[in-house]
Regions:
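PLP-dependent aminotransferase class I/II
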Residues: 9, 159-238, 242-245
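Active-site pre-lysine segment of PLP-dependent enzymes
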Residues: 83-96, 108-132, 136-169
Length: 311
């Protein structure tokens, strides 16, 4: 109700999230968007040396820069289709890294680290006193969520926090609602102490509960995205001018193979057709000409495919 303050502990909301994620409500912290939780985690860890797996979302490095620590990058390799090579990853990790940041599925590559590999990463990091932040903003779009999500690993490992939001899958960025999951009670308490009270308004808390119980929306959205994503991925694979990478999020990364054709050329052509795609030239560590586009409704997707076929 709007005339009264929200429950300061968000008890009912955490219970609903716990049921949705199959996790104890005691392991959950809610935030004013996943961005608040990312900022809070980074500021509280005070990492001396953070490792970010890229190319990825630029906000991580911006927040890390505010803490004054050193930032290093491990870049996914195009010749491996942006899939993480665990052996090379572990071998290249500096001994003094104390915070690892992953986006899974990753933005902008749409690649993903499977749960079994994530367990190896968490084991390695646990042995080397490295805390791991996993941004799962796009995980609900994955063909098999259980195959990707690390939430099931938070009971086993206390050196990890998984962060999610409702901006993408639930198409509700205006709510500013995110949540984090960790079994590290000491760290969780530190986060709660440094959070502003009532950081989530009553409307967002109520909407969050309704969203996580809406099985019809969840199933319909997943069916649409999965079927259309497969259709677009296969279609682009047959276009000689492009190379598409196996997608796990609600978008596809495409490399332009045709000489003299640039990402801006395609961006401009799409704008003329009243479509918006991402020119990826601004992403660090993404060498070459790339575009990225989101999966839309079938009609818009077909419209984009017809445009790409012209090249």
């Amino acid at each position: 109700a709007l005339p009264i303050y929200p429950d300061r502990n968000y008890t009912s909301l955490k219970k609903t999230i716990g049921e949705y994620c199959h996790i104890s409500p005691e392991h959950i912290v809610v935030g004013n968007g996943s961005t608040e939780l990312i900022s809070l985690l980074i500021s509280q860890r005070q990492a001396k040396k953070a490792l970010v797996v890229g190319p990825t979302y630029s906000e991580y490095e911006r927040e890390l820069a505010l803490t004054g620590g050193t930032i290093t990058e491990y870049n996914l390799k195009e010749d491996l289709n942006f899939q993480l090579d665990l052996e090379d990853f572990f071998a290249s990790m500096a001994e003094d890294v104390d915070l690892l940041i992953l986006c899974n599925p990753n933005n902008p590559t749409s690649s993903a680290i499977k749960n079994r590999d994530m367990k190896h990463i968490l084991t390695f990091c646990n042995e080397h006193n490295i805390f791991v932040m996993i941004d799962e903003t796009y995980v609900e779009f994955a063909p098999d969520i259980a195959e990707i999500t690390a939430i099931s690993l938070t009971d086993e490992f206390d050196n990890v926090m998984v962060i999610r939001g409702v901006s993408k899958f639930y198409a509700a960025p205006g709510l500013r609602f995110g949540y984090g999951i960790t079994s590290n009670h000491e760290f969780l308490e530190a986060l709660l102490i440094h959070q502003n009270p009532w950081n989530l308004n009553s409307v967002a808390a109520y909407a969050g509960e309704r969203m996580f119980k809406d099985n019809t929306y969840q199933q319909t959205t997943r069916q649409l995205i999965c079927s259309e994503r497969d259709r677009m991925y296969m279609a682009i694979q047959n276009m000689p001018a492009f190379k598409a990478y196996k997608p796990y999020a609600n978008f596809i990364l495409v490399r332009i193979l045709k000489e003299s054709l640039t990402s801006f050329d395609i961006f401009e052509a799409a704008i003329k057709e009243r479509m918006m795609i991402r020119d990826c030239s601004s992403f660090k560590s993404l060498d070459g000409e790339y575009i990225r586009f989101c999966i839309m409704n079938p009609e818009d997707n077909t419209h984009l495919l017809k445009l790409l076929e012209q090249f």
